[in-house]
């Protein structure tokens, strides 16, 4: 069931049939709906990119070692789940990029979207290549540029949730989820984005493993 759910995400996104709270979305004007859709695409792309950035390494390691459950049956369930999570996220991300490209009507805007999406795809390729060939490879040089840029946009530098008490952190998380849900954004994207952002604010980029 989990595998089917992950692999169907791109199809559901194509037809815009995600579960969402659309009360305010329905009441919005055409221009308002355009902006709400734009925000949903951007938030979804960022969240899925960060998820894939870490999960693809876990999936590769799991496949290479043929990770198994360690039970009496000793099935390769962990390997299957990690692989399907990454594959499903990649197809989901691809469809969101296509939707964002189609969202614009001007050629300049479409070219900007293609450029940004190209940078994201290049980063994912570099992560895979560096993991397989090492930091000394050609892709390692490119990856170091991404890492250098990433050090300047670490959410933990602006909001360090470890310094907050659990009550305040919980209220912030719930408030952010409610605000995003009210925009009509798919609930799966909301929970993923808030989870990723919370992990970054708690532990930095190392928290993506969680």
Protein language model annotation of sequence segments:
Residues 1-139, 207-210:
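Alpha-helical transmembrane segments and membrane-interface helix-loop junctions
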Residues 117-210:
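Alpha-helical transmembrane segments of multi-pass membrane transport proteins
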